[in-house]
Amino acid sequence: MALTMSAKSVSARAQVSSKAQAAPAVAVSGRTSSRVMPAPALAARSSVARTPLVVCAATATAPSPSLADKFKPNAIARVPATQQKQTAIITGASSGLGLNAAKALAATGEWHVVMACRDFLKAEQAAKKVGMPAGSYSILHLDLSSLESVRQFVQNFKASGRRLDALVCNAAVYLPTAKEPRFTADGFELSVGTNHLGHFLLTNLLLDDLKNAPNKQPRCIIVGSITGNTNTLAGNVPPKANLGDLSGLAAGVPAANPMMDGQEFNGAKAYKDSKVACMMTVRQMHQRFHDATGITFASLYPGCIAETGLFREHVPLFKTLFPPFQKYITKGYVSEEEAGRRLAAVISDPKLNKSGAYWSWSSTTGSFDNQVSEEVADDSKASKLWDISAKLVGLSA
């Protein structure tokens, strides 16, 4: 069911992966980080082989003994199939929406959460801080800004023998004040490369695992954003999302052409565009795979999490004024904990098991299947997006 690796693309990227240190297979007591290339560090690339001058590599530094003793990361472990609970992979589960969704699922006692994160120690500290029970979660390294890391994650997960009942694509980067683009290990603009392309590869490589879910109700959830929905007031705040003719993406969103529409770089728009791409991907997956696999594909906007770490790179004045504005003016404010419960419901609630849905919430009616923007609903453009994305990540139909 998963798309197959393009031999030409694999060969082109082999030079990169052979130089980069492989991601750790199990958790270690250390802090893992990734280096992101600035534009000047990029070498010239073609649309087929884009080998960056600097390779993103995982590095680890040992924490102090006291921290290592206190926070021992829970590596994913083999458990007999008959003893396994329902399993959900959540990307970006070390903070914010992802962490609180993991907490809500773990609290049911019916789910095991695989926290797919870049930093083992941060994830372990976060899980302990919110009180996730021991044995209810494990941590597996994933850096979505590296396609090699995505493939290594999938290999490690499959080797664990874990079942997969839900895949939640939540992790995202948002660089609203960036004046110059940043790039992934594979040479893609960072927001598009991480938020869209990294998740695109991850979902395709795990489709067969989801299809074979023992609970017979597998779900693939990709988090969207109201800022990418031009049907809303928030979605019409400039710069508005617009993928244009996808010429920038077709070129690989490189240093010379870093926006999906081929226009001048704008950090806030790059994030919005990536979320439009995520929502279009959900619709494509629903149309291509739902009937044959039974997998439920859905996206959601859980509400305005005005105090999320996603805004860490915004200007201080915005971070001060935005939460009260959402609480008292728009009334759209939602806490990280409540947003996490909503995401957990989309993962597990039988009433929200609708493929192709874009879930939103209102204060009066609760959850509802919302209308997507005209661009997200453009299936012809979405099909083109799919084909380009598959080529960029090394997959073929």
Curated annotation (Swiss-Prot):
Annotated GO biological process: chlorophyll biosynthetic process; photosynthesis
Pathway(s) the chain acts in: Porphyrin-containing compound metabolism; chlorophyll biosynthesis
Compartment(s) of residence: Plastid, Chloroplast
SUPFAM superfamilies named among the record's database cross-references: NAD(P)-binding Rossmann-fold domains
Pfam families reported in the protein's UniProt record: adh_short (PF00106)
Transit peptide as recorded in UniProt: 1-57
GO cellular component, one term: chloroplast
Primary localisation category: plastid
Enzyme Commission designation: 1.3.1.33
Signal sequence annotation: none
InterPro entries (alphabetical): NAD(P)-bd_dom_sf, Prochl_reduct, SDR_fam
Enzyme class: oxidoreductase
Molecular functions per Gene Ontology: protochlorophyllide reductase activity
Keyword terms of this UniProt record: Chlorophyll biosynthesis, Chloroplast, NADP, Oxidoreductase, Photosynthesis, Plastid, Transit peptide
Catalytic activity, reaction form: chlorophyllide a + NADP(+) = protochlorophyllide a + NADPH + H(+)
Family to which the UniProt record says this protein belongs: Belongs to the short-chain dehydrogenases/reductases (SDR) family. POR subfamily.
Function of the molecule: Phototransformation of protochlorophyllide (Pchlide) to chlorophyllide (Chlide).
Protein name listed in UniProt: Protochlorophyllide reductase, chloroplastic
Organism: Chlamydomonas reinhardtii (Chlamydomonas smithii)
Lineage, uppermost ranks: Eukaryota, Viridiplantae, Chlorophyta, core chlorophytes, Chlorophyceae
